[in-house]
């Protein structure tokens, strides 16, 4: 029981640490917005902050996976030792000349408590991956405009006289179009019929930034965000 209690305490502390990091991320973001004098802030700075938060969130998810894996290994070890002990006792009862006396009431209570603890740990560990996967999926479905800094990395020979706002307008329209996962690649003519602000410079720029894919037929597909 002492080992199980220590194990539960370790997992509870890990969960508390995760909650603290999450609250700290929210607090830092709100504090940064207040220092800028507005909750909207500078769009470029907000995008940079969002990238930093996503990176910290990814690190946090990795820690959660490690904790869940360690929790599962601990439960498997406890269950294996318990099964081995029960088998040894049964083997002794079957082979020894002297029958092992039945468990006392106190021993039975200790055994039942240990089994209950293992079962409780198993129930708590199972849903860990579902909210984490959901959070990662939601993070991947968030649209981000191309920042001015990123835009400047595209050679002038590729982007020509393209303006950043026109590039982001087309990128957002494509993102919204492909939010329906059942939609396949789209042609330039189809984009024009949908009133998208499409032009060769914008498509080449998005392709250069690895945000879209152009096949040999000129059909456009949106690449998944990292």
Swiss-Prot record:
GO terms, biological process: attachment of mitotic spindle microtubules to kinetochore; cell division; chromosome segregation; mitotic cell cycle; mitotic metaphase chromosome alignment; mitotic sister chromatid segregation; regulation of microtubule polymerization or depolymerization
Keyword Methyltransferase: no
Keyword Cell membrane belongs to the record: no
Keywords: Cell cycle, Cell division, Centromere, Chromosome, Cytoplasm, Cytoskeleton, Kinetochore, Microtubule, Mitosis
GO molecular function, one term: microtubule binding
InterPro entries in UniProt: Ska2, Ska2_N
Major location (coarse): cytoplasm
One Pfam family of this chain: SKA2
Chain's role: Component of the SKA complex, a microtubule plus end-binding complex of the outer kinetochore that stabilizes spindle microtubule-kinetochore attachments, promotes alignment of chromosomes at the mitotic spindle equator (chromosome congression) and assists suppression of the spindle assembly checkpoint. Kinetochores, consisting of a centromere-associated inner segment and a microtubule-contacting outer segment, play a crucial role in chromosome segregation by mediating the physical connection between centromeric DNA and spindle microtubules.
Subunit record text: Component of the SKA complex, composed of ska1, ska2 and ska3.
Protein name: SKA complex subunit 2
Organism: Danio rerio
Gene: ska2
């Amino acid at each position: 029981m002492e080992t199980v209690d220590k194990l539960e305490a370790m997992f509870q502390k890990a969960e508390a640490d995760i909650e603290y990091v999450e609250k700290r991320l929210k607090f830092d973001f709100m504090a940064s917005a207040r220092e800028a004098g507005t909750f909207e802030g500078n769009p470029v700075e907000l995008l940079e902050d969002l990238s930093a938060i996503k990176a910290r969130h990814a690190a946090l998810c990795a820690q959660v996976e490690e904790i869940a894996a360690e929790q599962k290994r601990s439960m498997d070890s406890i269950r294996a030792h318990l099964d081995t002990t029960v088998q040894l006792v049964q083997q002794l009862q079957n082979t020894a000349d002297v029958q092992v006396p039945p468990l006392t009431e106190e021993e039975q209570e200790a055994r039942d408590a240990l089994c209950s603890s293992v079962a409780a740990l198993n129930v708590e560990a199972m849903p860990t991956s579902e909210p984490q996967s959901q959070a990662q999926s939601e993070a991947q479905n968030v649209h981000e405009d191309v920042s001015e800094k990123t835009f400047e990395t595209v050679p002038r020979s590729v982007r020509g006289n393209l303006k950043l706002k026109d590039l982001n307008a087309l990128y957002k329209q494509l993102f919204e179009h492909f939010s329906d996962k059942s939609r396949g690649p789209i042609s330039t003519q189809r984009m024009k019929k949908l009133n998208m602000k499409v032009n060769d410079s914008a498509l080449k720029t998005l392709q250069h930034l690895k945000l879209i894919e152009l096949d040999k037929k000129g059909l456009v597909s949106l690449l998944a965000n990292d």
